[in-house]
């Protein structure tokens, strides 16, 4: 299972760190994903959910 939020689709994104001299190094920004158990089609299932989805009430835990 990929580390992508089941509800919002948030996932890892890549970019660059830029120093004062504008040198660049690759970096990744990872979302705050939590493994939660939710009801999907009436059955409990473990999925990745972002902290933002949990806080906003988009997730109904079991």
Curated annotation (Swiss-Prot):
Annotated Gene3D superfamilies: Ribosomal protein L28/L24
Domain of life: Bacteria
Membrane-spanning segments: none
GO molecular function per UniProt: structural constituent of ribosome
GO biological process: translation
Matches recorded under Pfam families: Ribosomal_L28
Protein's UniProt keywords contain Manganese: no
Keyword Nucleotidyltransferase: no
InterPro entries: Bacterial_rp_bL28, Ribosomal_bL28, Ribosomal_bL28/bL31-like_sf, Ribosomal_bL28_bact-type, Ribosomal_bL28_sf
Key words of the record: Ribonucleoprotein, Ribosomal protein
One GO term describing the cellular component: ribonucleoprotein complex
Family: Belongs to the bacterial ribosomal protein bL28 family.
Protein name in UniProt: Large ribosomal subunit protein bL28
Gene that produces this protein: rpmB
């Amino acid at each position: 299972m990929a580390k992508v939020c089941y509800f919002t689709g948030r996932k890892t994104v890549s970019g660059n760190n830029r120093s004062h001299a504008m040198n660049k190094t690759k970096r990744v920004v990872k979302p705050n994903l939590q493994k939660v158990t939710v009801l999907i089609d009436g059955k409990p299932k473990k999925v990745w959910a972002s902290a933002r989805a949990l806080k906003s009430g988009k997730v109904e835990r079991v």
